[in-house]
Amino acid sequence: MSFTPGKQSSSRASFGNRSGNGILKWADQSDQSRNVQTRGRRAQPKQTATSQLPSGGNVVPYYSWFSGITQFQKGKEFEFAEGQGVPIAPGVPATEAKGYWYRHNRRSFKTADGNQRQLLPRWYFYYLGTGPHAKDQYGTDIDGVFWVASNQADVNTPADILDRDPSSDEAIPTRFPPGTVLPQGYYIEGSGRSAPNSRSTSRASSRASSAGSRSRANSGNRTPTSGVTPDMADQIASLVLAKLGKDATKPQQVTKQTAKEIRQKILNKPRQKRSPNKQCTVQQCFGKRGPNQNFGGGEMLKLGTSDPQFPILAELAPTAGAFFFGSRLELAKVQNLSGNLDEPQKDVYELRYNGAIRFDSTLSGFETIMKVLNENLNAYQQQDGMMNMSPKPQRQRGQKNGQGENDNISVAAPKSRVQQNKSRELTAEDISLLKKMDEPYTEDTSEI
C-alpha cells in the first residue's frame, strides 16, 4: 500500500482547498474550471518539466511534497545531522522517512545599476525513489543532492510514496521533529512553492517573507513547532543586505568626507553632549588641556572615547541622578562671546558643579583604573615641560661619540700676528724707522 503525505491511510480522498489542517495550497495551482478572482493579477503558468527559465537557473521537473528551504547567507553548507532532515508528514510512517534534498538554482535578476545578480539556491525534499533522482541509490555522491533518512528507515529500498499531483495534492509546510538542527544560513520557505514563478523579484521576495511569517504563525497555533526555525527578523535583515551586496559583519570604511561629516555632527551638539573619538578629538571638542581641563594625555587625547582604556573609566562616571542630587550646583550668568555684534545678544548661563566620585580597592579593575588615572591626570604639565626643554644638540654625521666638549667648536684658519694683537719688544730697525718718521719733511732739490 502506497502512502500519501498529509493524508491518513484510512482516507485517501482529496477535500480540495482545506484550511486549518496544516496544508497550504501552491500559489500557482489555480483551478481553471472555477471562477477564481485574481485581484487584478495575471494568472501564472503552471511549472512543468518542459518549462524554461529566461534568466538562467535549472527547472524543477517534479513537485515536492513540502515547501523549500532557502539559503540567505553565502558560503553556508546545506547539511543535517545523521538521522535528521526528513520533514514531518501526517500519514507517513517512520520506516518510509527517507529521501534527499535537491538543490534548485534559481534565476538571476538585473539590479538597478544594470548588473546581473544570481539568487541564492533553494532546496526541496523528495522521498527515496521519487523526484529528479528517483533512479539513484541512497548515498550516491551527486552534486546538489543531500541524502537524509530516519533511524527506522531502510535506505536499501525505495520509499512507498506516491508522486505529488499538483492538481489534486496540496503542498505541506516543512516542519521537523523536535531536536532537529536547521542548517545555518537557511530558513524554511513558508509560501509553499516548489517552483519559481515569473513575477518580479521584489514582489516575490516580499510575498515570500509575509507568507512565511503567516504560515509559521498558523503552524504554531495548530501544533507545537520544533523550534528549528531561526529568528525571521535576523534572516530578513541578512537577506536584504545580501541583495544589496553589503556584508553585515564587514566594518564600514571611513573616508575623509565621512570623518568630516562625523566631526561636524559632533561639534553641532551642545558642549556637554559631545563624545570625542577618532574623527573629533578631545581638543576639538573641549579645547586644550589646562588647569580647568586637566584630564587626558597621549593616545587618549587622539582617540577620545574610542581609546581601549576609556570603557573602564566610564564605570566611574556618575549617572544623571548622581550628577544633580550628589553634587554642589551653582547657576551663574556669563558673558556671551559668540555671535556678531549686529545680532541680538542671548543670555548665557553656566551650571557649575562640584562633586566627588568615591571608590576603594575592592572595585573591579582597581589597579587598571589607578594606572589610567595616573597617566592622564595633569598629563598636560608633563607635555608642556617637555616642550619648554632646550633641544638636545644633535651630533653631526660622521662624528664619533666621546669626543668631549670641543665636538661642536668650529675650526677656523689661524690668525695673523696683527689679528692676534699680541705685544712684542721693538727691534733696532723698528726704532730707526720711528726716528725717521719724527723728522720734518724736506723737499729734495738736488739735480741729477
Swiss-Prot record:
Domain CoV N NTD, residue spans: 61-190
Protein's recorded name: Nucleoprotein
Basic and acidic residues bias locations: 422-439
Species of origin: Bovine coronavirus (strain Mebus)
Biased composition (Low complexity): 193-223
Main location: virion
UniProt modified residues of type Phosphothreonine: T174, T427
Protein encoded by which gene: N
Post-translational modification: ADP-ribosylated. The ADP-ribosylation is retained in the virion during infection.
RNA-binding, as annotated region: 52-194
Function, as annotated: Packages the positive strand viral genome RNA into a helical ribonucleocapsid (RNP) and plays a fundamental role during virion assembly through its interactions with the viral genome and membrane protein M. Plays an important role in enhancing the efficiency of subgenomic viral RNA transcription as well as viral replication.
Record-annotated CoV N CTD domain positions: 259-384
Keyword Secreted on entry: no
Subunit structure: Homooligomer. Both monomeric and oligomeric forms interact with RNA. Interacts with protein M. Interacts with NSP3; this interaction serves to tether the genome to the newly translated replicase-transcriptase complex at a very early stage of infection.
GO cellular component terms listed in the entry, alphabetical order: host cell endoplasmic reticulum-Golgi intermediate compartment; host cell Golgi apparatus; ribonucleoprotein complex; viral nucleocapsid
InterPro entries: N_prot_C_CoV, N_prot_N_CoV, NCAP_bCoV, Nucleocap_CoV, Nucleocapsid_C, Nucleocapsid_N
Composition bias type Polar residues, residue spans: 1-20, 29-38, 45-55, 399-409
Biased composition (Basic residues): 266-276
